[in-house]
């Protein structure tokens, strides 16, 4: 997604743009233009007709090495991002993001210690649409609008975990290189590098396999954190629910990616596997060992379907961690399985006691 203000000034000021970030939107991820290289890099010396392909490849490699791999370059890139997009310094929002990023970094570090070689830079920008992206140099930005759609940290963590999955696999740099290489192949026959810049700005170049890989990594990261793994499915249910009431937040849409429903259902399958094939959910009803357990009611701004995936996540975690060997019991209005909270009954739900008794008969 392009920034609304200063875009043409930005193009004139900078000699090149490499962008390969992805943004959480209903049904897909959308291109997020990343800030451009500083003019002193020397793109001006290679833009023009008749540039040899080998020279262009060398310049591209030099660009990526500086702005994706070097500490100096990626910090320079990050500062340019903040200038272009603007920074939201809201204390409460930034505190939440600091906590989520710290938790995700620890979770990722437990399975991929390379994260500590290039720690993520991140900031909240002022855009009011539903959006977050990771681009070159492990530089991330989160739209203010994300918080108007997602209100709990578990779902926000899924969004950011997906973006960090792209970063860990270097998808942004691979996407930028692929985009530019398609143009560079024709450089010796007259294609200008100026057209390459336009190609990078206007194309995502994040493949479906990359998207699926980032989705899978988000699940792995969440299951190595204290966040509810059911949030991986719940977030997509919420996006589908909110798209009906907040369509202006989801105007940018790309149709050549898996749908929200497909992503949700893929995560439900992962949760089934994570539970050692004991629990699943469909149409708002959670099943344990193939038998109906509960159909949660809507609560607050959360639909019953969205809420069901959080219950599913708690049950999956209980079975994964062996808490199912214990009897279900009640703590206040909360159904417990061992030391794992499963569901807190609201006024419109069945009583916690009744649910605990049912769970003990089918678990």
Where are the model-predicted features located?
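Post-HEXXH active-site segment of zinc metalloproteases
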Residues: 171-200
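Solvent-exposed coil/turn segments that connect beta secondary-structure elements
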Residues: 102-103, 126-128, 137-139, 145-147, ...
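Peri-catalytic and regulatory segments of divalent metal-dependent proteins
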Residues: 40-180, 225, 245-248
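Short glycine/threonine-rich beta-strand-turn micro-motifs
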Residues: 327-346
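C-terminal capping/extension segments of zinc metalloprotease domains
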Residues: 5-7, 16, 20, 35-75, ...
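Residue-level signature of catalytic and energy-coupling elements of molecular machines
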Residues: 97, 142, 214, 259, ...
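C-terminal partner/receptor-binding element of secreted or periplasmic proteins
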Residues: 349-363
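C-terminal segment of classical bacterial N-terminal signal peptides
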Residues: 24-35
